[in-house]
Amino acid sequence: MVIIETLPLLRQQIRRWRQDGKRIALVPTMGNLHEGHMQLIDEARARADIVVVSIFVNPMQFERPEDLASYPRTLQEDSEKLTRRGVELVFAPAPADVYPQGLEQQTYVDVPGISTMLEGASRPGHYRGVATIVSKLFNLVQPDLACFGEKDYQQLALIRKMVADMGYDINIVGVPTVRAKDGLALSSRNGYLTAEERKIAPQLSKIMNALAEQLSNGERHVDELLEQTAEHLRNAGFTPDELFIRDADSLQPLGVESQRAVVLMAAWLGKARLIDNQQVDLTL
């Protein structure tokens, strides 16, 4: 495995693989890798000759400087995990290489609608930062496919719309959420949980699944369902942050023609902001 930190060296290596007719998969990450990331890599490996993993803590998608500063940087440990997984290349640039003129002078990629709805409404600029860095990685790596986790449902929808709108010839592969045995979705943020909070954390997915079951059984009073769910979360020890029930395909409010719903949840537990989602078939 090779670790590349500069754009010219990355382009050089990608050009060689392209000349050899290799099929390339990209797995974009911010590092601090866990088993969920490994599942993305395994999916990429099954679909391509070459797997490229990017590790870049993107300052453009952080609202608060203290959050950016405190985000774990674990390149050595990550590299060891990726070597064992058989990854061919890790792209780990410095912010100055990605944004040489600084963030203020950087050209942005803005995906209208999705980037400012739901979670984007309370995190202005976040999804613009995501779209910009992913677009830049697509241009640099020129992958045939890219793998993203379904845990961040809105992000996956954003990337798919960007690819369609911009005409990228890249297959976007959504990989199901990886969970611990007790149901908690794997996340780098889980490391912020205390031992006691970790015992409480699986209640998030249980409460979410209960809501999904009510939808599956025909309940459609969305506001009442969300109020009940918020109360269940508070009783379990969480501070609800974002709770939505939306059409799984459009992310718009449920309508009479909606065939699939998605429950989107974000809640604070101590210092950890946990997110999760569950899709529901409304046609059964």
Swiss-Prot record:
GO terms for cellular component: cytosol. (R)-pantoate binds at residues 61, 155. It holds the Pfam family Pantoate_ligase. Keywords: ATP-binding, Cytoplasm, Ligase, Nucleotide-binding, Pantothenate biosynthesis. It catalyses: (R)-pantoate + beta-alanine + ATP = (R)-pantothenate + AMP + diphosphate + H(+). It comes from the Bacteria. GO terms for molecular function: ATP binding; pantoate-beta-alanine ligase activity. It is found in: Cytoplasm. CDD domains: PanC. Its EC number is 6.3.2.1. It is an enzyme of class 6 (ligase). ATP binds at residues 30-37, 149-152, 178, 186-189. GO terms for biological process: pantothenate biosynthetic process. Beta-alanine binds at residue 61. InterPro entries: Cyt_trans-like, Pantoate_ligase, Pantoate_ligase_C, Rossmann-like_a/b/a_fold. The active site is at 37 (proton donor). HAMAP family: PanC. Homodimer. Catalyzes the condensation of pantoate with beta-alanine in an ATP-dependent reaction via a pantoyl-adenylate intermediate. The reaction proceeds by a bi uni uni bi ping pong mechanism. NCBIfam families: cyt_tran_rel, panC. Belongs to the pantothenate synthetase family. This is Pantothenate synthetase. It comes from Serratia proteamaculans (strain 568).
